[in-house]
Regions:
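Predominantly single-stranded RNA-binding modules in RNA-associated proteins
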Residues: 1-149
């Protein structure tokens, strides 16, 4: 039996039956803690899904991690730059979310920007390409150069 802390517990409560069915685990919710029990592989997949949900992804997007070659990666912005976090996040998001949307479209990944982290869900190779693009943007590359990755 595994247990994790989840920030978006309301969404999990609403969709508990669907999550249990798709992940093949039994879920118990106490406060903001989610316990789940099942086969070891199912528990591992559930831990990835709950980590993605806690990061801020929707349940529908997080359940894509159930697909075999999909992965979830978190990039910590502070590890790659000393600049002001607000400025770096502005570069990542772009005008009206255009840069983030282009990264998502080109890489075929789901990209979400949190307070000081960037989360990416998608096929393994696509996630690596998106990570390279995001890290280059964080370090100061021009958006046009980043789109080549």
């Amino acid at each position: 039996m595994e247990e994790v802390f989840v920030r978006k517990i309301e969404d999990i409560k609403k969709n508990k039956a669907e999550i249990e069915r798709k992940l093949n685990v039994k879920i118990t919710i106490v406060g903001n803690r989610v316990s789940y029990e099942g086969d070891s592989l199912d528990e591992y997949e559930a831990s990835l899904v709950f980590e993605a949900i806690s990061f801020g992804f929707s349940i529908k997007v997080a359940l894509n991690l159930k697909i075999e070659d999909n992965t979830f990666k978190v990039i910590h912005i502070k590890e790659h730059t000393r600049r002001k976090l607000k400025d770096v996040k502005s570069r990542l998001i772009g005008t009206e979310g255009k840069t983030r949307r282009i990264i998502s479209d080109i890489s075929n990944c789901f990209v979400l920007i949190n307070e000081s982290d960037v989360g990416i869900i998608g096929y393994v190779e696509d996630v690596e390409n998106a990570c390279t693009a995001v890290i280059n943007l964080i370090r100061g590359s021009k958006q046009a150069n980043m789109y080549q990755y």
